[in-house]
Amino acid sequence: MARLDPHSYNDDTQPETETLTWKARVDFRTRRLHAEATLTLKEASAGPLDLDTRELEIRSVVDAEGKPLPFLVSPPEPILGSRLRVELRPGTKQLTIRYRTSPQASALQWLTPAQTAGGQYPYLFSQCQAIHARSVVPLQDTPRIRIRYRAELTVPKELKAVMAAGFAGREEQGVEALERYEMPQPIPPYLMAFAVGRLAAKELGPRSRVWAEPEVLEAAAEEFEDVDAMLRAAEELFGAYDWERFDLLTMPPSFPYGGMENPRLTFLTPSLLAGDKSLVSVVAHELAHSWTGNLVTNASAEHFWLNEGFTVFAERRILEVLYGTEVAALHAALGRRALEDAIHHFKDHPRLTALRTNLTGVDPDEAFSQVPYEKGYLFLRAIEDVVGRPAFDGFLKRYIESHRFQALTTEQFIAFMEKHLPGVLAKVDAEAYLNTPGIPLGAPAPRSERLEQISRMKGKVPRAEDVKDWTPAEWQLYIEGLR
């Protein structure tokens, strides 16, 4: 048995899933999905196949001919959930699992009408990162494995289902509607995502539109109207955009994150609707994930910095292009303070403040912090400072192109670095970033005239004329400086 991801029952000696066909009926009354998942394997196989599940009620497992396959659901483990072991007959390449989800499924949030902007209809959305896809679909829930999928969602006719995939049609059948989606690019399971509610859309550009409840649609469209320019800037920096569309979904207020980088349909908190586009750095971050995270993916949560450190670096490069180096420096300064707070938070668990972590027996949600984001960013900034921006830009494009649609470990990144930028890791003291707690001595620090102005105001009450044009980032830095 070879389990390379501490947060999955996946056994690397068993066949990988190649495609998923998923059908689900959304039941708002019972807060369940009644579903079936057809897994097509990369090769025909025999013997045990271990899948990740969490609180799924498995009803049957059959092969492509409809013949039952023996299966066993193990007792639940607090972090991993339950292992679904299916015994495959010789030559089995496809299996279908019929099941229903729990009302407490960890990936699903069911909202009452009162929790929505319109107040008339319920709402459902999914959040599968880091290891919650298993509460919706029985599969190999590890980013080491990428799948293509087709999906059919049956929902109340008055509602709209959207997915982080390509739209393939809608059919109304009595009081219900069947929505079809296809994801042609292979994705890690945590990027499966959908939402169901009273939704409307407005086009933003040739490759993007925004979805939202009708009550907030116009505000969302105005706030995010520059997304196409952002997309073009990102392509100049990181190469062609591989996901065809970059649509946005403005979520209800209970969405627990600033944003989630679901491919083709980024989920965003409505708190970004400031009215002046001052908080669109979150959109830049989620867009950057289209290359760093979605295209090149951490092999497990132990290498999360490969997703987030690269993405913060990419986000700030996009901000530089669109809004200038001063704005990027403001965000870097905020990030540095967030990193210092995270390191203090984990003072009793300092190993969690290194980039390369051992998370065996640790829930990735409990280990979540700004460390992989901001310390990872500092590591890449340190490398850029040594080799220079043109050389690092070339390296970054080569890194992305060489690992498209692949999962990567820290060790593989190190090997790639040594091959293409030999000797640089020693110059930046990579050990201090990757394996040592805390902030390395000499880590890059943001500098700009606006940062110096804010620093000079520490402990002072600013004059109205001095701050009349301040952005939220400047106010946040000033207020945090009062601590």
Locate each region found by the language model.
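General structural signal for secondary-structure boundaries
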Residues: 1-4, 18, 326, 409, ...
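Acidic/His-enriched low-complexity segments
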Residues: 1-245, 368-370, 385-387
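Long, contiguous hydrophobic alpha-helical segments, chiefly transmembrane helices and signal peptides
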Residues: 33, 51, 125, 136-139, ...
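Repeat-unit-sized solenoid/scaffold elements
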Residues: 60, 125, 180, 379-381, ...
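Long, His/Glu/Asp-enriched segments that create or flank divalent metal/ion-associated functional microenvironments
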Residues: 437-483
